[in-house]
Amino acid sequence: MANRNGGFIGTDGLDAPDPVTGVAASGGGASISVSFTAPTDAGTSAITGFVAQASTDGTNYSAGSGTGTSSPITISSLTNGTAYTAKVWAINAYGTSAPSGASSSATPVAPRAVIAIGQANDGSGNKEEIDYFDISTTGNAADFGNLSVLRVAMGSGGGSSTRGMWAGGSGASDVIDYVTIASTGNATDFGNLLSATQGCSSLSNDTRFITGGGSSSPADRIQYVTIASTGNAQNFGDLTKNKAEFYSTANSTRGLWFTKGSGNSNEIEYVTIASTGDGTDFGDMTVECESAAALASSTRAIHGGGSGNKVDIGYVTIASTGNATDFGDLTVGRTRMGGTSSSTRGVFCGGTASPGGVIDYITIASTGDATDFGDMTYTTQYTSPTSAAHGGVQ
């Protein structure tokens, strides 16, 4: 039975909750996400909320704070590049629990986007280069390095707050490769897909990288790897139908694939990332098309563009299945472009239109038209972006 007051607030320690357990932290852009397990014994009164506090020295937990009613809690306004640990307190009407044990350290990072730049629009062919830029600061992309194998048609990339990853690609590749997002340089082999395929599309939270579809049989297969451990993919389940040359995105719990890439459609389907199984219908996009870009925050998933050089941007609330709602328009209509994000800003990179090297951005929480961000190093299509602070790692 709960029998303590942690001293944070409250008057009756006998009725305060037991301590929170299982505290873990992961870094985002100027923030950390703190996950935890609520106590079984809530005390005499139900738990009304939780407080997460950050520390840079493991002693003074006053470097930042966040509140919430469930796990995870985000602690914002932290310093990129500084390591933090976190503790969590549970609160009810009578008081506050003793502090949890400290999490392992997590380091916020600038929301860097890394983009496999794809196929040049000027006829010079496929490119192995990777571009990068800081999502929080408008401007042009710079060279990051090269893929481990020259290929395009990889759909969306994925990864964690530290690793960017790509899978499959032209020539029916089975390659999975990765980069360390904070350090420019060439990609390294991670492992192999279950079979070689191009036109697949990937998504991730901070622990699992999931790839779906592709032009090679079985074209409805979903497969996954654990991001922290190099190795080959395992079977996850099946998409609702065969799909290729499409795009995808995720938050920390759900992954979404948009349209089907072969013949116009408006389908959205989803999986629960932590649980292997088949895809489920989510709803419909605002337009029918092929190859619409996708990106997400922790709450919203966004689609943009598509075949016929669509300008349309639409959004859904990830936690609630249903049809997309109009968000706004791109600065120029295009298709075969990728999207990625920080916790607040989404970017669309490249595409088939002229100029094909354009980067647009939106503020994910606020509907409206996209704004010019800058340019990629090439004018390309089939771009495949990911970032250190996309929806799945917040």
Where are these predicted regions, by residue range?
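Pro/Thr/Ser/Gly-rich low-complexity, intrinsically disordered linker/stalk tracts
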Residues: 11-46, 80, 94-110
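Short beta-strand segments within Ig-like beta-sandwich modules, predominantly Fibronectin type-III
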Residues: 62-69
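Conserved aromatic beta-strand anchor motif in extracellular beta-sandwich/beta-rich domains
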Residues: 49-56
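Conserved short beta-strand element of beta-propeller blades
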Residues: 110-117, 146-170, 193-215, 238-262, ...
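Beta-strand-rich modules
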Residues: 75-97
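A detector of repeated loop/turn-to-beta-strand junctions in beta-rich toroidal repeat architectures
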Residues: 49, 125-129, 141, 151, ...
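Short loop/turn segments that connect beta-strands within beta-propeller blades
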Residues: 134-138, 180-184, 226-230, 272-276, ...
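A short beta-strand motif characteristic of beta-propeller blades
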Residues: 141-146, 187-192, 233-238, 279-284, ...
